[in-house]
Amino acid sequence: AICNPLLYSVAMSQRLCIQLVVGPYVIGLMNTMTHTTNAFCLPFCGPNVINPFFCDMSPFLSLVCADTRLNKLAVFIVAGAVGVFSGPTILISYIYILMAILRMSADGRCRTFSTCSSHPTAAFISYGTLFFIYVHPSATFSLDLNKVVSVFYTAVIPMLNPFIC
């Protein structure tokens, strides 16, 4: 829409719009089903209590009585795959948008930057906190720190979204 506004209605066919809506849902479902299927195969040692903000895989795995290295590896691989595929896609689109903005007049550039700069800010904050939670070595794992960060990406970022965007 910013790079080629006159071609937008041609490029964004109904089929592409449906794919762009359905695709993330399918990927999210596959991500969730991977973790859910793995969780049902794990042995648990009686009643235990965890202290997370919400039931996430990392604290959940601390309740397991068996070796969880493969499960932690699966969490890391799935989170890494989501980041590897979606991160560069977003980054490349931002580069194209930035190049289109830099070709505009000074007045148009100023208005466009003031309108569009909030989205990359929200995306980078969100991706940063998610990578902090899911893609870090287990040696630096801290449930209390993860709890603070998870509150940030589940409550603070969505609350700030109307103000940012």
Curated annotation (Swiss-Prot):
Query: Protein name, please?
Result: Olfactory receptor-like protein HbA1
What superkingdom heads the lineage?
Eukaryota
Q: Which stretches of this protein does UniProt put in the Extracellular compartment?
A: 37-43, 94-122
What task does this protein carry out?
Odorant receptor.
Carries keyword Cell cycle? no
- Pfam families cross-referenced by the UniProt entry: 7tm_4
Q: Hydrolase: is it a keyword of this entry?
A: no
SUPFAM superfamilies per the record? Family A G protein-coupled receptor-like
Q: How does it sit in the membrane?
A: Multi-pass membrane protein
Q: Which Gene3D superfamilies match?
A: Rhodopsin 7-helix transmembrane proteins (1.20.1070.10)
- Name its species: Apis mellifera ligustica (Common honeybee)
The residues on the Cytoplasmic side of the membrane are 1-15, 65-72, 144-165
Q: Name one GO molecular function term.
A: G protein-coupled receptor activity
